[in-house]
């Protein structure tokens, strides 16, 4: 029975590690940081160990069928064994490919919640309007995935928004939303355009993984916390109390603010989450110049030529330029149906990683 021996051995090692992690978890009942680290590892190793058990069972069935075919003379048993062997030969390569994908290195932030910041870039009013349009898309996408969205700050202008920030929490949010970082280009006829000319504008989207307190340590003495009256939507408390909070990390100058919560305490907690995410990003960029350049290239300046995706309204078309994927269903995508694009981006990323997997 042919199978990938190198892959088998690699997966078997993960299954052994999974058992060891389970035993270790029983011994660290008071070390909460260690418990978290082990559980993060177990989430991946348990999935691989379970897949390995099914793989081994299918492989054992194929090997047993081969043995019967080589030794048995009973025609009925031979027929059944041949069926088992044929099924194993079809399924084992499929299972092996799935196992390879499971072995691919993953972003340690994939399981984390995200903080998203959206800003208009090139294109004037249409850019501000599209910030609101794409925000509605993300809100619908969050609902489709049973994720929870919390608005951090919304700054409206005469026609749309000059800034929107929000948090999305749920299962594996960053693993999917991270592909939204970059310049989004929109092509459509503005409502004020009398001659029907198509205008092109852009907005920028930044997606940051939320960081826990244990991941980013902040010295309280290095913070300046300012309170001010919230502006815009937010309920009866707006402009009556200084509920909005702005936190400045003095050593770096990084600022995080929130005004959409109902109380100063709630806004302060949200602003701290934003600050941790921003400080984590700053630390990553400082430690890894290559990462910094990658993100800079990804988000860019907002220039029309630096787009990751184009939304063409007249032709009901969306094109993701990173993978040359074009879908003629802009109306559906803007209603939150982003999975087809994001799944294709994930598959493309996995293909690249697979090429470097020595198995």
Swiss-Prot record:
Name of protein: Peptide chain release factor 1
Q: What is the lineage of its organism?
A: Bacteria, Bacillati, Mycoplasmatota, Mycoplasmoidales, Mycoplasmoidaceae
Give the family per the record: Belongs to the prokaryotic/mitochondrial release factor family.
Q: PANTHER family in the record, alphabetically?
A: LD18447P (PTHR43804:SF7)
Its post-translational modification remark reads:
Methylated by PrmC. Methylation increases the termination efficiency of RF1.
Provide the species name.
Ureaplasma parvum serovar 3 (strain ATCC 700970)
Keywords on record:
Cytoplasm, Methylation, Protein biosynthesis
* NCBIfam families reported in the protein's UniProt record: prfA, PRK00591.1
Has the keyword GTP-binding been applied to this entry? no
């Amino acid at each position: 029975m042919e199978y990938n021996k190198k892959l088998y051995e690699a997966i078997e090692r993960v299954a052994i590690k999974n058992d060891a992690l389970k035993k270790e978890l029983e011994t660290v009942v008071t070390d909460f940081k260690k418990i978290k680290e082990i559980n993060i590892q177990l989430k991946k190793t348990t999935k691989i160990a379970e897949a390995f058990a099914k793989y081994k069972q299918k492989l054992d069935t194929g090997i047993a069928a081969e043995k019967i075919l080589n030794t048995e003379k009973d025609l009925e048993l031979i027929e059944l064994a041949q069926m088992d062997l044929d099924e194993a030969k079809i399924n084992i390569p499929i299972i092996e490919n799935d196992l390879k994908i499971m072995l691919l290195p993953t972003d340690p932030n994939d399981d984390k919640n995200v903080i998203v910041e959206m800003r208009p870039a090139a294109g004037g009013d249409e850019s501000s309007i599209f910030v609101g349009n794409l925000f509605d898309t993300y809100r619908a996408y969050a609902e489709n995935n049973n994720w929870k969205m919390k608005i951090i700050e919304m700054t409206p202008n005469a026609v749309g928004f000059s800034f929107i920030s929000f948090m999305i929490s749920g299962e594996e949010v960053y693993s999917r939303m991270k592909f939204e970082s970059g310049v989004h280009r929109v092509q459509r006829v503005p409502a004020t355009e009398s001659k029907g000319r198509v205008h092109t504008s852009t907005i920028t989207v930044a997606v940051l993984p939320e960081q826990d307190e244990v991941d980013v340590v902040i010295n309280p003495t290095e913070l300046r916390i300012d309170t001010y009256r919230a502006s815009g939507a937010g309920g009866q408390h707006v402009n009556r109390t200084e509920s909005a909070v702005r936190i400045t990390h003095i050593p770096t100058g990084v600022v995080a603010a929130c005004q959409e919560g109902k109380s100063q305490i709630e806004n302060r907690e949200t602003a701290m989450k934003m600050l941790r995410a921003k400080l984590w990003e700053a630390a990553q960029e400082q430690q890894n110049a290559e990462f910094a350049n990658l993100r800079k290239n990804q988000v860019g300046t907002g220039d029309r030529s630096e787009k990751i995706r184009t939304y063409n309204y007249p032709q009901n078309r969306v094109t993701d330029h990173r993978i040359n994927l074009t879908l003629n269903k802009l109306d559906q995508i803007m209603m939150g149906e982003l999975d087809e694009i994001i799944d294709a981006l994930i598959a493309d990323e996995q293909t690249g990683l697979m090429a470097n997997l020595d198995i």
